[in-house]
Curated annotation (Swiss-Prot):
GO CC terms, sorted: 2-(3-amino-3-carboxypropyl)histidine synthase complex; cytoplasm
GO MF annotation, one: metal ion binding
Predominant subcellular localization, coarse grouping: cytoplasm
BP GO annotations: protein histidyl modification to diphthamide
Subunit structure and binding partners: Component of the 2-(3-amino-3-carboxypropyl)histidine synthase complex composed of DPH1, DPH2, DPH3 and a NADH-dependent reductase, predominantly CBR1.
UniProt-recorded name of the protein: 2-(3-amino-3-carboxypropyl)histidine synthase subunit 2
Manner of cofactor binding, per the entry note: Binds 1 [4Fe-4S] cluster per subunit. The cluster facilitates the reduction of the catalytic iron-sulfur cluster in the DPH1 subunit.
Superkingdom as given in the UniProt entry: Eukaryota
Amino acid sequence: MNDSVLVAPSLSTAQTEDTFEFQSYGETEHSRSYLGSDVTKDNLVELVSAYYSVPELIQYFEEHPQYKKITLQFPDELVLDSSIVVQLMQQELVKAEDETSQSFNTIDTDEVLHNEKSCGNCSGCDCSSKIDKTETKRKVWILADTSYSSCCVDEVASEHVKGDIVVHFGDACMNAVQKLPVVYSLGRPVLDLDLVVSQFKLKYAAKDQKICLMADAPHSMHMKSIYDILHDKEGYKNVVYSDINQDMLQSDTHIVGYNNAVEHDERLRKCVTCGNRNIYAEVDVSELNEYDLFHVTIPKDPHLLYLTTKFQSVTLYDPSSGMLNEGPFPSMMKRYKFMHMARTAGTIGILVNTLSLRNTKETMNKLTKLLKENGKKHYLFVVGKPNVAKLANFEPIDIWCILGCGQGGIVLDQYNEFYKPIITPYELLMALSDEVTWTGQWITDFKSIINQIENEVNDSDDMEQDILSSGTECRSDEDEAPEFNAVTGKYVSTSRPLRQIARLEIETPVEEVRASDSTELVKQFSQTVAIRNTVSTSAAFLQTRHWTGLGSDYKDDEDGEEDGATVEEGTAGVARSYQFDELNKKT
């Protein structure tokens, strides 16, 4: 007989304190393909320092000692390098401060005593003129939660810590911000030029084709080298290339680790400006739509759509895989459809996903004024990163208009995930015009939109002045032209709700009007929905819902009982320990 002690089987999994701790990752190594293939633990710090031009960045802050609170903004794909960059900056900045303080302590005492504004602290007094050395110390913060539209400077996040300056790392759109000075560290990624040239030659066999070379901001440093190989060695005489448009930078904006190669080549000249890029070539570039675009890296969908409207064709080169991508790309046909849907939309939701960009508030004010003049309702939403769940909470909105960066801050909704269409201010401007126009352009610059809105308002004012000066009578009781949805073909009666309120005449018995203290929230007068005798599109939408809120089924009770339900005590406690659980444990 076996003398071993029988142990009952475990009926549940053993749970200790370690069970509820966060999962610890076993792998500490991360992929840093932008640093090259020879990355080791020994040379990682050196490569990161060279990639972000940390020595030049430190030199900039030594030359500008007024910036005490420094905020660093990293995108998600580069945030793994943030700790190394901060450590390098703090070491050098502290060393520079120590040298400055030592040089200050060596000042001759007689020079301090002769200063009438200072006692020189010769007797150990604690007067207000004593210099507080703690104020000279610099602090560095890493800004988090910038995964959406990371190409833009997050000025609002920097103001949370009262930052003096923002250092933006990685790809950037170069859009101007409201207040703070900005330093860009684009990075110096490693790129296999021979592989790029070989893929280029496979795509473009004819050497007389008109081709433009372009890349994101970090990889733009390689465009001049690729141009020299293709133009001088391979014989592509009609090839041109792009570089960063430094003319759009503000006076308090600086780029570290960037050199414009055009300054050292007298053959090249700037021909055309394409957004935040300048096109350089030896020959004249008349129209970009005659050129094919060869773009290194995969741009975001909004910027990619912009490029498809500027060039004859677009071919993308992925540096991570070394392969070409020729589509499918975002199409303007869906934008044309959404523009027509906006023409008959009665309620517009304006999405503001950033408050840092310059001219955002002015564009917002111009749009709201234009919507009111066209008789449409609008609501403002500052939601940060839009998603399906957020926007689905506002069902009365007919269409959304998003205010964001044209490079990565606009939602295109390629897979129809959102319940309502999302358009841009330029598309909304075309939808509000009297004539149906479609230019096929993709304009996202706030300055251009503001100018077009002002021109639209001025044209309407001039038309009204011409009517008044000609003496033509405008009949206010004349019926407006019916509007139909261009997508569904149905008649739309609520496309201009604010304009209809002034002309609406509701006939109802006086007794019903006096009985406005009814328990019903929404009442329907002669096929017109009103709240407290006031027309409302929200009330009209509420009527279409099966469930209209608590107490909505009170009047439809079949039993005719006027007594409410009996109030009973509900469940109390927190999720892990409700009250009835505690009672069960005691019993």
